[in-house]
Amino acid sequence: MSQSLISFSNLDNWLFVAPALLLAVLSGYLSERVGIVNIAINGGMVFGGMFLSLMSYAFVPNANDSAPSWSLAISIPLSVIFASAVGFLFGIAAIKLKADHVIVGTGVNLLGTGINFFVAQNARSLLNDTDLRVRYSFVRTGNSVSIEGIAIFAFAIIFVLLVWYLMNFTKTGLRYRAVGENPNVIDTQGISVYKYQWFGVMASTMVAALAGCCFALSPQVPSFSSGDVSGFGFIAIAIMIISMWRIIPSIVISPLFALAYVLTTGVVGNANNTYLLRTIPFIISLLVMMVFGYLNVGPKNVGKHFDKGLR
């Protein structure tokens, strides 16, 4: 048991899974701080992972080869850009048409799963492969972790800290947060509330897609045919609430939940026990929300449509 828990393999998985969860939490933060409830984080992650899997085929010369790691510098940005189209659809429905945010988010989640399933089922004709695989293989020698994993982990931490600084110490960031609290006050100052909301939705979707890319690159995800991101989009919402819609606490909590996820999925045992253990991170998040959730107050205008007539 101890060998399965304390290993470089689990550490390597954690270096990819922790950034995925942290970025997913940031995705929720970016949307709710402008008053948009975004439960489509899971769907955004699925689209990001799917596009990254598809992009990896463009750099594979032979059927049995793996895409070179340097191609990630091209694949990840393109995957995020492609996935942003989903954010545009979300914005049209939630901001322009003023549809219910939760219903729109549910639709995006279902859309992501459906499209990913279609691509995986037609992988032989579309990709000349038997499955929708993540065709990246990083070098790991002996008791070590991949350089790519360390780089992605460091990038995620720096990126999140940069967003934290912008949100708390710049005029634009303070206005951004004010949109989720009282958009009518912002509107009376001649500032476009819709502009900030559109930016929030698009940024949230792109960060969710980036989280999906990180998850898909984890060594424990050899195939993306099921479009399964282990419900990280939903657990990210729970962590956002536990963190009281603050970035710094999420930087601490997200890696801890990711560690619990990696350790439970790495336990060697019979199938029934393994699936039961995988529920531990989700059970913990529910228990913590039950204990501390009532103390947390989110942005006052979250989930409400902006109405200029309420000035």
From Swiss-Prot:
Transmembrane stretches, start-end: 11-31, 34-54, 72-92, 101-121, 147-167, 198-218, 233-253, 257-277, 279-299
KW Nuclease (keyword) present: no
Domain of life: Bacteria
Gene Ontology MF: a single term: transmembrane transporter activity
Bilayer topology annotation: Multi-pass membrane protein
UniProt keyword terms in alphabetical order: Cell membrane, Membrane, Transmembrane, Transmembrane helix
Places the protein is found: Cell membrane
Pfam family, one: BPD_transp_2
Any one Gene Ontology cellular component term annotated for this protein: plasma membrane
InterPro entries per UniProt: ABC_transp_permease
Record's protein name: Uncharacterized protein MG121 homolog
